[in-house]
């Protein structure tokens, strides 16, 4: 049988197996002929011939017809088996244990397909997955093109992973190998070069924008990026960098050199509308920010020829010079910078203008308040320097929310007790710290006995007295008892807050004006009239702060804070000695990190005062000595702490969030105080444009919903 074919037939199934002799052993060759055969029977026949265990998915059904006229070895026979299944929409997925699984091709992409590489790329129609890294081309751009070349309807798929810039391709090994060859051909660096062109007259930003705009076309007529040169401006050196292929870069460089030409010297006027800065303030900076440069004097173009002005000079950053000012009889020093204006300038004209000298040429800068714009009359060749300075100054300044916490607790106890004696013929024991001297009481009593009035001496004696007083006046003897016990507590918790621009001082005042008697005068006439002079002093909370935002979100705060109040127990405005004020001030500068709380001042104070007045010898007698003594005792404790927390606000969203947070805090506190019910602001209505009316709660809910992330 060696060298001859043996043909064996199973009804409608024909299969020929031929064994050939070789020096090393036996090799099997196969030829197949199937007509109208059930596909599962075909799979079982191949499984038996290849000695492989095959699992068939229940969805694999149908009949096949195929015929092979050539003899095939085992590898070719297996590839023939895979090709037949592929034609009918099925695929073979090898398992780790050597078992083959036959499933539908559209389900195979989610199975455990072997991972191929350059050493083992796979053969023929077997399913493989390949990971291909890209070095020069973006995977997201190449993936859609490769999908059109793959069997997307079957097991083929092409996806990209952007963070690693790789392609993940699944499909038949032969197809994937062809796609990998295409990727290797496309993923190559172009022969690009970079050329730096220094400009002498034109602005680098303007030239780069012009050249790039010329390269822009609509999508239909867009040229490939490899045929275009990319131009980037370097404002620091006033040069442009051209990047492109060898055949495109020279054209761009030639265009740039043609644009970099000296302009004809002629005057021109340009209006620059400012976005954030104030026009009048910016004129002062342009004319008065002293830097290196010559400062010359010249006469103004005003109708008054006798008036004079001094001018400023602006030099390029790569030039240096020194000079002195003249014309006004004064001189000043200048500091260096990349671009500068002399510190001397003339008086403002009716439109708030200045005339300065830049690179030896006069430039007139005027402000228009109504539109917040600058009107600049200048030679065209120096306008670029002016615009750069203006653009750097006209920026949105961040804001700072400064929140303060003032916590103060005061506790004071006092005791005043004393007995005074007097005799018209022998003298008296008088203690003035009791509030009512006994001599004043005796004068008032004598006056009452003589004319029956209590409007002078008694009124004066009792006007400033607190507590209880009792006594007698009989014959030559009189006695007066005074007693007073006081207990005062004062708790202050204030949380003032204020928002201000960076480097802008802000003031916050909350309080009341207290009248203070400063003088009194009696006029003589038909009746005695008393004329009082009164001044008003503001008491309450004062906060003055100037924040400066530094690098790293730190804030330098210059603080002036004052907390004042009228002292308890001595607050009557008609007191003979006036009103007593409690004042606490803090004036310092601190460096605080954004959103951090820092204590800027504190006081822990405890005071105890005890005063004993007595009559010598008599005041020391046990029991009876109390009749000849007066005792005053005062104890006070005070705890005061001041805290600050700055919050940097850089955009409107942060400002809106801070506003909502403040409102919610106020609303919650109000509801806690009232126990129940809505906030007072909830019922207030806001009339917006278009005639619509909303409550404050509706507006707050709309704002919160706008900033709520999607999907919640």
From Swiss-Prot:
GO terms, biological process? protein secretion by the type II secretion system
Chain positions covered by the region annotation S domain: 653-712
Query: Localized where?
Result: Cell outer membrane
Secretin: annotated span: 399-651
Q: Does the keyword Nucleus apply?
A: no
Give me the ranges of the annotated region Disordered.
Answer: 288-342
Q: Where is the signal peptide?
A: 1-27
Q: Which Pfam families match?
A: Secretin, Secretin_N, type_II_gspD_N0
- The record's note on its domains: The N0, N1, N2 and N3 domains are periplasmic, while the secretin and S domains form a channel that is partially inserted in the outer membrane. The N1, N2 and N3 domains each form a periplasmic ring. The secretin domain forms a double beta-barrel structure; the outer barrel has a diameter of about 110 Angstroms while the inner barrel forms the central gate with a small pore in the closed state.
Q: Which InterPro entries match?
A: Bact_Secretion_Sys_Channel, GspD-like_N0, GspD/PilQ, NolW-like, NolW-like_sf, T2SS/T3SS_dom, T2SS_GspD, T2SS_GspD_CS
Q: In which domain of life is the source organism classified?
A: Bacteria
**Keywords for this protein:** Cell outer membrane, Membrane, Protein transport, Signal, Transmembrane, Transmembrane beta strand, Transport
Q: Which PROSITE patterns did the record assign?
A: T2SP_D
Know the name of this protein? Secretin OutD
Q: Where is this region: N2?
A: 191-264
- Where is it mainly found? membrane
| Role description | Involved in a type II secretion system (T2SS, formerly general secretion pathway, GSP) for the export of proteins. Required for the translocation of the multiple pectic enzymes. This subunit forms the outer membrane channel.
- What's the subunit arrangement here? Forms a cylindrical channel with 15 subunits.
- Site (May serve as a pivot that allows opening of the central gate for substrate egress) at 511
**Could you say which protein family the record assigns here?**
Belongs to the bacterial secretin family. GSP D subfamily.
Region feature (N0): 28-124
Carries keyword Signal? yes
> Gene Ontology terms, cellular component aspect?
cell outer membrane; type II protein secretion system complex
Region of interest: N1: 126-190
Which gene name belongs to this protein?
Answer: outD
- Note the PANTHER family from the entry: PROBABLE GENERAL SECRETION PATHWAY PROTEIN D (PTHR30332), SECRETIN GSPD-RELATED (PTHR30332:SF24)
Region feature N3, mapped onto this chain: 267-394
């Amino acid at each position: 049988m060696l060298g001859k074919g043996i043909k064996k037939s199973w009804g409608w199934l024909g299969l020929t197996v031929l064994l050939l002799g070789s020096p090393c052993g036996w090799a099997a060759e196969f030829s197949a002929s199937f007509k109208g055969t059930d596909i599962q029977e075909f799979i079982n026949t191949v499984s038996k011939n290849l000695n492989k265990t095959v699992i068939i998915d229940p969805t694999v059904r149908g009949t096949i017809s195929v015929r092979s006229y050539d003899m095939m070895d085992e590898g070719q026979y297996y590839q023939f088996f895979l090709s037949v299944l592929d034609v009918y929409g099925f695929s073979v997925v090898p398992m780790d244990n050597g078992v083959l699984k036959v499933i539908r091709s559209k389900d195979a992409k989610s199975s455990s397909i072997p991972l191929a590489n350059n050493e083992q790329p796979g053969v023929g129609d077997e399913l493989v997955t390949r990971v291909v890294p890209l070095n020069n081309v973006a995977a997201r751009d190449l993936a859609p093109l490769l999908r059109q070349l793959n069997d997307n309807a079957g097991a083929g798929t092409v996806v990209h992973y952007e963070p690693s810039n790789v392609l993940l391709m699944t499909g038949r090994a032969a197809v994937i190998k062809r796609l990998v060859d295409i990727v290797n051909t496309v993923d190559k660096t172009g022969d690009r070069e970079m050329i730096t062109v220094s400009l002498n007259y034109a602005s680098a930003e303007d030239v780069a924008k012009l050249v790039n705009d010329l390269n822009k076309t609509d999508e239909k007529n867009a040229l490939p990026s490899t045929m275009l040169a990319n131009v980037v401006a370097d404002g620091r050196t006033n040069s442009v960098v051209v990047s492109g292929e060898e055949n495109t870069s020279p054209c761009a460089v030639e265009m740039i050199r043609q644009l970099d030409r000296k302009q004809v010297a002629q005057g021109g006027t340009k209006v620059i509308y400012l976005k954030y800065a104030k026009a009048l303030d910016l004129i002062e900076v342009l004319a008065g920010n002293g830097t290196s440069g010559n400062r010359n004097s010249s006469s103004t173009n005003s109708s008054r020829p006798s008036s004079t002005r001094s001018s400023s000079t602006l030099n390029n950053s790569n030039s240096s010079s020194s000079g002195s000012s003249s014309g006004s009889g004064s001189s000043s020093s200048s500091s260096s910078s990349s671009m500068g204006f002399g510190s001397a300038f003339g008086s403002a004209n009716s439109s708030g203008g200045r005339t300065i000298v830049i690179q030896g040429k006069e430039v007139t800068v005027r402000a228009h308040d109504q539109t917040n714009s600058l009107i600049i009359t200048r030679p065209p060749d120096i306008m670029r320097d002016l615009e750069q300075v203006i653009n750097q100054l006209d920026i949105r300044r961040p804001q700072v929310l400064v929140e303060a916490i003032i916590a103060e607790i005061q506790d004071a106890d006092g005791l005043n007790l004393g007995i005074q004696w007097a005799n018209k013929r022998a003298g008296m024991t008088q203690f003035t710290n009791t509030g009512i001297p006994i001599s004043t009481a005796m004068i008032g009593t004598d006056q009452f006995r003589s004319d029956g009035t209590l409007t002078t001496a008694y009124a004066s004696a009792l006007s400033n007295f607190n507590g209880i007083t009792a006594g007698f006046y009989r014959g030559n003897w009189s006695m007066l008892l005074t007693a007073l016990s006081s207990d005062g507590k004062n708790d202050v918790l204030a949380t003032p807050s204020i928002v201000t621009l960076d480097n802008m001082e802000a003031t916050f005042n909350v309080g009341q004006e207290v009248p203070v008697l400063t003088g009194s005068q009696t006029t003589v006439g038909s009746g005695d009239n008393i004329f009082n002079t009164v001044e008003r002093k503001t008491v309450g909370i004062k906060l003055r702060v100037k924040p400066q935002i530094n690098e790293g979100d730190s804030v330098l705060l210059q603080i002036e804070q004052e907390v004042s109040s009228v002292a308890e127990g001595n607050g009557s405005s008609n007191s003979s000695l006036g009103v007593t004020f409690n004042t606490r001030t803090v004036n310092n500068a601190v460096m605080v990190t954004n959103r951090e709380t820092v204590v800027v001042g504190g006081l822990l104070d405890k005071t105890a005062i005890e005063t004993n007045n007595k009559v010598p010898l008599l005041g020391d007698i046990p029991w009876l000595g109390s009749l000849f003594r007066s005792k005053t005792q005062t104890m006070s404790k005070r705890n005061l702490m001041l805290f600050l927390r700055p919050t940097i606000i850089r955009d409107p969203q942060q400002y809106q969030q801070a506003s909502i947070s403040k409102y919610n805090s106020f609303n919650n506190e109000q509801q806690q105080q009232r126990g129940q019910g809505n906030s007072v602001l909830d019922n207030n209505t806001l009339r917006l444009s278009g005639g619509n009316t909303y409550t404050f709660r509706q507006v707050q809910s709309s704002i919160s919903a706008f900033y709520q992330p999607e999907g919640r």
